[in-house]
């Protein structure tokens, strides 16, 4: 497996088929926060995403938000609102926070999938930790200046990878 290759590339989190994940033996979902669950610098959770998370819980998935965001209060507030376990200051692409999330959920890497919007943080860390990865399109067009640099390289890397709409 190539370290920067997601298993799937999907338009948004709510487009991911939970029945397929369950059939693939997945029981835990690790989720990035900014631009994956909520647009960056907002607390507004899209209704379709909230419904998807409710369905995931009802099906028996264990869920944990793993965010690089340094504003712990924002991360924890989002997690409480969404009913998720949460880890902030994740320092992805280092895999340590993902492993902590798995431990918190009582899941193995084989049972988990990581969903995120960045190739060089989320996908890299998930693959490094041995977790299947699903890349989603970012929810907002505004990024931090250093993320904008990575997005240039991401666009090149994703040129030939079809996105499941």
Each language-model region and where it sits:
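Asp-based, Mg2+/Mn2+-dependent phosphohydrolase catalytic module
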Residues: 2-31, 38-43, 50-62, 66, ...
């Amino acid at each position: 497996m190539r370290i920067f290759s997601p298993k799937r590339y999907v338009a948004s989190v709510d487009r991911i088929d939970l029945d397929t994940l369950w059939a693939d033996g997945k029981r835990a979902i690790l989720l990035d926060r900014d631009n994956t669950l909520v647009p960056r610098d907002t607390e507004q959770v899209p209704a379709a995403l909230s419904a998807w998370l409710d369905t995931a819980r009802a099906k028996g998935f264990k869920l944990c938000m793993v965010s690089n965001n340094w504003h712990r209060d924002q991360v924890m507030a989002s997690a409480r609102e969404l009913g998720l376990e949460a880890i902030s200051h994740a320092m992805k692409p280092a895999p340590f926070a993902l492993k902590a999330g798995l431990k918190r959920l009582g899941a193995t890497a084989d049972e988990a999938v990581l969903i995120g919007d960045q190739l060089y943080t989320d996908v890299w860390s998930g693959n490094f930790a041995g977790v299947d990865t699903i890349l989603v399109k970012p929810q907002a067009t505004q990024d931090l200046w250093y993320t904008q640099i990575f997005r240039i390289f991401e666009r090149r890397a994703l040129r030939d990878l079809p996105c499941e709409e």
